[in-house]
Amino acid sequence: MRKFSKSHKLDHVCYDIRGPVLEKASEMESAGTKILKLNIGNPAPFNFSAPDEIIHDMIYTLRDAEGYSDSKGIFSARKSIMQYSQLKNLPNVGINDIYTGNGVSELITMSMQGLLDNGDEILVPAPDYPLWTAAVTLAGGNAVHYICDEQNEWNPDIDDIKKKITDRTKGIVIINPNNPTGALYSEEILKEIVEVARSHQLIIFSDEIYDRLVMDSLSRSGYSVHYL
């Protein structure tokens, strides 16, 4: 009988917080240890529910939601994103620059599939949110990890980034505020990364999904590469 094996593209696809780490936590939980499962963004078990007005709006518009929307996403949603960008003073964000999807994970995967040929490289922070490495690998590319130094408050090592750029490098991923380290990069650090990207003509993928979850004092506000 013919045996089917998984694709070698999965060799470097790991998601330990939903795999080995979760299995160990479940084992400890079974033995009586109380476990707080903060490994995934699952708000419902912690009683964070969607606001009632959003639930009501979803019910009200359900009939109108049948069928396909514009390939870039629902116009009203894209307009709201544009207005939000304007409130944050982000320059040059027009309605036609905005694409929406079923969560950022889908859009990351689509971006890598559309950009990378076999052997192309994307610079990814280490440690990283594992989706980035997985998406690059599944698209046939190579995730080249640059160091985020624990001894330097988990900031990116700019010299390490420069050393790892090759003729096959197409882009660099910035996760700020960072997942999983929680580091918030300074304007100076971001400017250095932007200058490296400019000089080598690299695309910057700026993952800022946690930009409103900064718990430090207001004096330590987050910076976005979009301002630079």
Regions found by a protein language model. Give the residues of each.
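Aromatic/hydrophobic pocket-lining residues that form π-stacking "cages" and hydrophobic walls in ligand
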Residues: 21, 25, 132, 193, ...
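N-terminal small-domain helix-loop-helix segment of the aminotransferase-like
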Residues: 2-6, 11-103, 110
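Conserved PLP-anchoring active-site segment centered on the Schiff-base-forming lysine
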Residues: 114-136
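Short acidic capping loops at alpha-helix termini that bridge into adjacent secondary structure
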Residues: 92-98, 118-121, 168
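Helix C-cap/helix->beta junction micro-motif
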Residues: 31, 139, 199-200
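Active-site phosphate-binding strand-loop segment of PLP-dependent enzymes
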Residues: 144, 149-220
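A short helix-loop-beta submotif of the ANL/AMP-binding
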Residues: 138-144
